[in-house]
Amino acid sequence: MNKPVAIITGASRGVGKAVAIMLAEKGWNLTLTCSSSLKEAEKVAKECNDLGAETLVLVSDVSNDLKCRETVDATIEKWNKLDTLINNAGRTVFNAHENMSGLTTEDFVEIYKTNTVGPYMMIKESEKYLRKSPIASVAVSYTHLTLPTTEY
C-alpha cells in the first residue's frame, strides 16, 4: 500500500504528538522530529507504529539549515515522497511583559530562528517534493499560539 507521508517537527509532545497519532490512525507514514526529547519522540513513534504507521524519528533543529535538509532527505530516502509538512516545532522564553530585560537578544534571535526561519527552511527544503504530491499540504502550528511573553 502506498501510504501518504508527513514530516512533523516538534512531534515529541503536545500538538505534534496529537497530530502524529491522528495521522497514524488515518494510515500515514511519519517522520517525527524533536530537538532534544528523543525518548518522548520514540514513545510517540511506538504509539504510531502500534496504529500501523511506519515511522522515522530524527533529532533535528529547524533553526539549522543543514538539519532541515537532512530531515527532508532522510524522509525521501525512506519513502521516496512527501505529502505533508507540519511545522510544529517552537521555542519561547516565558517572561512577563513588564520585564523586557528578562529576554536577551540571544533569546530573541533563537526564538525567531526556530519559530519563523525554521518553518521557512522546512518549506524551502520540502517544496520540490510537495509539488509532486496530489494531496500536498503545509501547516504551521506554533506561530498561531498567543503566549504571554515579551519576544513578540
Functional labels for PLM-detected ranges:
Residues 38, 59-71, 105:
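The beta1-alpha1 cofactor-binding region of Rossmann-like NAD(H)/NADP(H)-dependent oxidoreductases
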Residues 26-43:
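Conserved glycine-rich Rossmann-like NAD(P)H-binding loop of the short-chain dehydrogenase/reductase
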Residues 144-152:
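Single conserved hydrophobic/aromatic residue that forms the stacking wall/gate
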Residues 96-100, 104-109:
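Substrate-binding pocket helix/loop in short-chain dehydrogenase/reductase
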Residues 12-14:
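Conserved glycine-rich cofactor-binding loop
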Residues 3-4, 53-54, 81-82, 130-142:
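Active-site loop of short-chain dehydrogenase/reductase
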Residues 88-96:
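Conserved NAD(P)H cofactor-binding loop of Rossmann-fold oxidoreductase domains
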